[in-house]
From Swiss-Prot:
The entry's keywords: FAD, Flavoprotein, Oxidoreductase, Tricarboxylic acid cycle
PANTHER family: L-2-HYDROXYGLUTARATE DEHYDROGENASE, MITOCHONDRIAL (PTHR43104:SF2)
A GO BP entry: tricarboxylic acid cycle
Gene3D superfamilies, sorted: FAD/NAD(P)-binding domain
Catalytic activity: (S)-malate + a quinone = a quinol + oxaloacetate
Official protein name in the record: Probable malate:quinone oxidoreductase
Family according to the record: Belongs to the MQO family.
The protein's enzyme class: oxidoreductase
InterPro entries cross-referenced by the UniProt entry: FAD/NAD-bd_sf (IPR036188), MQO (IPR006231)
Organism whose genome encodes this protein: Parasynechococcus marenigrum (strain WH8102)
Record keyword Translocase present: no
Length: 502
């Protein structure tokens, strides 16, 4: 605000993005590609980008394409598995690959910093779970997106696929696995930085780290019609105000409190349930080098999606690593570097009953979390040895993973725990927030396209934006789920541009 009471032009932006994680970074990249003239401001309360859930050691799963994550294909009462969610997630990840390929082709994105190939494997070792995996394989392999999936119960082949899982295993124990060679590991922290740094250097994006959103309110004109959003920031130089016609809340677990503060009625339907996580991290680089795959097992009954056990090859800050977990825990924080008061301060008259209803109807989840909290180091090591029989405790250390805030949504049937992510937007599209967790980052491009469709509908329909979007995403307008030829064309293009094999 200037001395004469008018608002300074340098404090007004076309969009304010809150949270310097993968979601805001993806939206910033898309908006800049569609209109390089937009003034964008990104605000982050920490001192750098991607330090919460987007960080590779915080993210519960990387490179999600539903190739190996068994929780996306639950068993149904009729003995078949549900495949719709897996197909949708796979299509979403293909969209991300398509976008990254376009940016790399333009020389705007170095994919070597965040994208690495690693086979995706599902492995199980009880008769019941083998029957489940076989049913999953038979159904998915009939779908074009998963046609390259391979099945094996042959020990020599399984040892080649996942040597650490098979070494030292009882020869009498039945083991089965499926494998997709064209899998990836994605360091979303590195990708976030790869998006943001060139935008910041060119002046296309203003970034303020160490800056917290204190308040967010809608301004009104003299005729009482709604105008810009007024965002109050607290940063190193004190408190200041910025304004924008559009605000995106992409602050991970911190999005819900900000959404509630905005006052939009759509926020009343939501509450959050935080789940924390722990990893066992291998400290032996030679051991980690023996595996180049993500090996997923089957989650325990009642376990949340982020707790599907896996022995996971990851590249963290350019270094190849091996992790096992995650083990679930509970903290009332909504962010890893949040406050213990996050959960209680999010309770409102509109969401208290749904929260209580979810607690009463998800006893298995509550019991699972209690059991996880009680786990001793020896019990965690026992869980690791189920995957890796030769694992030695001295080679592994415990590391705290990121926080996830699962959605609790009010409905006519009462409160329900909603897995996955959801875009919540004001009726006029001037504000949007992303709530929820898995698969999240891997489908960020698809999710941010939904934000554009709901909040920039008129501009997206313009010839200029339409032409630019078509150039970025050549398959846009088509449906790779229903059109195998389109899916094949997308994959051939992405594989060529991103150097993917299989």
């Amino acid at each position: 605000m200037q001395q004469d009471g008018s608002f300074s032009a340098d404090a007004r932006f076309d969009a304010v993005l809150v949270g310097a994680g993968i979601m805001s970074a993806t939206l910033a990249a898309l908006l800049h590609e569609l209109d390089p003239g937009l003034r964008l401001l990104l605000v982050e309360r920490l001192e750098g980008p991607a330090r919460e859930s987007s960080a590779a050691n915080n993210n519960a799963g990387t490179g999600h394409a539903a190739n190996c994550e068994l929780n996306y294909t639950p068993m149904q009462a009729d003995g078949t598995v549900a495949t719709a969610k897996a197909v949708a997630i796979n299509a979403g990840f293909e969209r991300s690959l398509e976008f990254w390929g376009s940016l790399r082709e333009r020389g705007e994105l170095d994919t070597s910093s965040f994208l690495h190939q690693a086979a995706h494997i599902s492995a199980v070792w009880t008769a019941e779970n083998i029957a489940f995996l076989r049913q999953r394989f038979e159904q998915l392999s009939e779908i074009p997106a998963f046609a390259a999936m391979r099945w094996s119960e042959e020990r020599t082949e399984l040892t080649d696929w996942m040597p650490l899982v098979m070494a030292g295993r009882d020869l009498k124990q039945p083991v089965a696995a499926t494998r997709i060679e064209r899998g990836t590991d994605v360091d979303f922290g590195a990708l976030t930085r790869a998006y943001l740094e060139p935008l910041q250097r060119s002046g296309a994006l203003c970034v303020e780290y160490g800056t917290q959103v204190r308040d967010i309110k809608r301004l009104r004109r003299g005729d009482m019609t709604e105008a810009d959003w007024r965002v109050i920031l607290q940063g190193p130089s004190g408190k200041r105000e910025v304004r924008a016609p559009f605000v995106f809340l992409g602050a991970g677990g911190g999005a819900l409190p900000l959404l509630q503060r905005s006052g939009i009625p759509e926020a009343d339907d939501f509450a959050g349930f935080p789940v924390s996580g722990l990893w066992l991290v291998c400290g032996d680089a030679q051991l980690a080098a023996k595996q180049r795959a993500k090996v997923y097992g089957k989650a325990a009954v009642g376990a949340p999606p982020m707790s599907v056990p896996h022995l996971d090859t990851r590249w963290i800050d350019g270094q190849r690593s091996l992790l096992f977990g995650p083990f679930a825990g509970f903290s009332s924080k909504f962010l890893k570097q949040g406050s213990l008061f996050d959960l209680p301060s999010s309770v409102r008259p509109t969401n208290l009953l749904p929260m209580l209803q979810v607690g009463a109807t998800n006893i298995e989840l509550v019991q699972y979390l209690i059991n996880q909290l009680r786990q001793s180091p020896e019990e965690r090591h026992d869980a690791l040895q189920q995957f890796m029989p030769t694992a030695r405790a001295e080679d592994w250390s415990l590391s705290v993973a990121g926080q996830r805030v699962q959605i609790i949504k009010r409905s006519k049937q009462g409160g329900r725990l909603q897995l996955g992510t959801e875009v919540v937007a004001s009726m006029d599209g001037s504000l949007a927030a992303l709530l929820g967790a898995s698969p999240g980052a891997s489908t960020a491009v698809t999710i941010m396209l939904e934000v554009l469709q709901r909040c920039f509908k008129q501009r997206l329909a313009s010839a200029a934006w339409n032409e630019r979007l078509q150039a970025l995403l050549p398959s846009i307008g088509g449906d790779p789920v229903q059109d195998p030829a389109l899916l094949l064309a997308m994959r051939q293009r992405s594989d060529a541009l991103l150097d993917l094999q299989g």
